[in-house]
Design a protein with these regions (language model features):
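P-loop NTPase motor domains
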Residues: 3-9, 14, 23-249, 325-328, ...
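Extended, compositionally biased alpha-helical segments that mediate assembly or anchoring
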Residues: 329-341, 346-351, 358-386
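Short intrinsically disordered coil segments
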Residues: 185-189, 299-300, 351-353, 363-369
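Surface-exposed polar/charged interaction patches
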Residues: 92, 113-114, 148, 312-315, ...
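Short helix/loop capping segments that flank catalytic or ligand/cofactor-binding pockets
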Residues: 179-181, 228, 293, 344-347, ...
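Conserved ATP-driven motor cores of ASCE-family P-loop NTPases powering translocation/secretion/packaging/pilus
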Residues: 15-40, 233-347
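Short, exposed beta-strand "edge-strand" segments with a Pro/Gly-rich flavor and a Y/T-containing core
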Residues: 18, 86, 92-109, 167-169, ...
Length: 386
């Protein structure tokens, strides 16, 4: 966060009582993509492709959040109802009359209304009670995303987040309680989705010569939080990263150990491990033997490489005389693996300016400084008394 701020970027604080992201509001991107001109040979196909891509991302986000809340995959019927419901809102929601973009609560109202196109997907056979039964689970999940649900107004209001293309952006989730993994995962999913959508839209606009071509890099940190909140989120992450990969968007997925990718079934674990196997480059910090997962199989790691990584995982030794702890042996050290080629070990050395804006241990550092200052005063008092 300090780094992005120092670079003149945007910092959005997400959590209860803070910024709002309307998860249905892709209007800024869609209005820009509407400006893509007809192609000489393909007509309006480039414009339609770009707009359809944004709508697919929106649908992927909504269904992903539904699966997070349910901790299981939703049915194909429910997925189809979500996609068709979003399509109906695009066609029928009167933005000028309402004075705002459609929200998730509007999708709830639409599903409740038993719109004929949704009734057809639900196969209610003209029976209102059957429709209510067929749509009940879907409505339960959608209501949870509204201001009446567990997330409050974070996703169901007018967006206060407007990402400016060309500037660094970070989403700050620090206000969310560490124990609320579901809320953390939901906000992660939304921030990753919107960040990816902005970059994707910029690439479409650059293809149409409406933007200078820029190279973006998406950082998806704390992957373990999302997967721990619900194993079903592995499908959301898989879909999102595949979309990004297909569009040539550079992305980094960061987690602590390969154990974070061991999920509730072999099928889900295989999908999660695939994130690593498909990565062009993997940067490995210190790991214990038990934390390596399938790294040995995927990257054919030598005994020397494994030994080096395990050595890096050790804690810094404590000086019994001064009470200070030595720098951990693995601080700043990584092994770069590209396929099955021998890895390249390297050490990151930060400049003074970089050290300050990358200090993620600031709270502990401040506490330690206070402790040392208090200890010094106590020692001085005891010496004076003696």
């Amino acid at each position: 966060m300090d780094l992005i701020d120092a670079m003149g970027g945007q910092v959005f604080h997400l959590g209860p009582g803070q910024e709002v992201i309307n998860i249905l509001d892709f209007s800024q991107l869609l209005s820009e993509l509407e400006q893509i001109p007809d192609d000489i040979t393909r007509g309006d196909a480039p414009r339609r492709e770009a707009i359809d891509a944004m709508k697919r991302r929106r649908a992927t986000l909504v269904t992903g959040l539904l699966e997070l809340g349910r901790d299981a995959r939703i049915s194909e019927k429910e997925r189809s109802m979500v996609v068709e419901g979003l399509r109906i809102l695009d066609e029928e929601f009167d933005i000028e009359k309402e004075g705002r973009q459609p929200r998730i609560s509007d999708l709830v109202a639409l599903v409740r209304s038993r719109h004929p196109r949704l009734a057809a997907i639900a196969q209610d056979r003209g029976d209102e009670e059957r429709y209510a039964e067929r749509a009940e689970l879907l409505l339960d999940g959608l209501i949870a995303l509204t201001s009446s649900g567990v997330y409050g107004s974070i996703f169901d209001g007018d967006s206060t987040v407007q990402i400016e293309a060309g500037r660094p952006v970070v989403f700050d989730l620090s206000s969310i309680d560490d124990g609320d993994l579901t809320l953390q995962a939901a906000v992660q999913a939304v921030s990753w989705s919107f960040g990816s959508a902005v970059v994707d839209a910029e690439k479409y606009l650059a293809d149409a010569a409406l933007r200078p071509r820029r190279h973006y890099f998406l950082v998806m940190d704390e992957l373990w939080r999302m997967l721990r909140a619900s194993s079903a989120m592995v499908f959301f992450v898989d879909a999102l990263t595949r979309l990004n990969r297909a569009r040539g968007i550079a992305q980094a997925m960061i987690t602590h150990t390969m154990d974070d990718l061991k999920l509730s079934s072999d099928e889900l674990t295989t999908i999660a491990w695939g994130f690593v196997a498909r990565s062009a480059m993997v940067f490995i910090g210190g790991l214990a033997q038990s934390e390596m997962g399938n790294l040995e199989q995927v990257f054919a790691m030598s005994a020397r490489e494994k030994s080096m990584i395990m050595d890096w995982s050790a804690d810094g030794s404590l000086n019994p005389h001064t009470g200070t702890q030595a720098v951990p042996p693995g601080r700043g050290k990584f092994l770069l693996k590209i396929g099955k080629k021998p890895g390249t070990p390297f050490e990151v050395e930060l400049t003074a300016a970089e050290m300050d804006v990358n200090n993620t241990n600031r709270a502990w550092t401040t506490a330690a400084e206070r402790f040392r200052a208090n200890a010094a005063r106590v020692t001085e008092t005891l010496e004076e008394a003696a």
